[in-house]
């Protein structure tokens, strides 16, 4: 594994040293292969996480990947510039202010337009520009923030408290309505009032902060009980009915009793696992499950005794489902982890294609018929073609559909009020 890692590092160093290649702080040869043993303080030593490698897989001991699971590049100042997935595809990118270290001025996802940010002299965001979408302006006042979008809709947030205890206590919505929130001295929510003036109160445990009761606008109260591990053990409803939960000494759920008195029980074969292997409902019917070491469902047996089995690849992707009577389906994925094929036991296959942004663009049925979906830059579907017929959609800046043209050419338009 070390040899594979070193080969990859040399390849990266070569690409980074080329005139066309981006410079990166991660190209330094003086960096460790493991994290420090503890927390360290002081000047930034310039070390950054460059890649995450799979070094041991019990299920595939002789087949380790030759590329990292994730890779990161940085600016010369050590700011995160790009994130790459295990296929080598850049999935996120960042741009920073040259005069203010660490201040992000742009960000984008793979195949999506770049969002940009502007700041005031104190480092607060004053504008967010989203191509093909809504832009936002932010104005800061004494204990309030005004947010205005490019459709001129305005919201105002009023705050109380300082530092980590600052909370939004009042919100003026674009339609003129007002909602309020109240908090205790520890910053925990204790009451909310909606736009119609209806108030909901939350009673909190003094030490744990757990919600012990919720009183609605009509004065009716739901109460909650807990055990010493802060797990919910009972819920008492306004009509006096009660539901309950029981746990074992490891904190695993062993029984649930509904407000109607019906009890569902859970059993565990592995003392170290939190995943149940048996579920018995109020009628006595039992379902059984088997799990992999990674928490993946391997088999499920229903109340009738029928068993469905599941298989996974090394990345945790489901590659096969085997049902009773030999009914099986098989799935395959591309290097980015996207489903590209589903095949049944008779060999009939459905194939899938994707854009660089990860949007599903085509579905090819077993008979070769092709259905396609086209998207705009924000990932919204603008046309769907199936069987030679096309349905198209148009949107406004807020992402709301404004026109729908059906397969027969009939068109519907939609208009919205200012908010």
Task: Please place each PLM-identified region on the residue numbering.
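Extended charged/polar low-complexity repeat regions
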Residues: 1-419
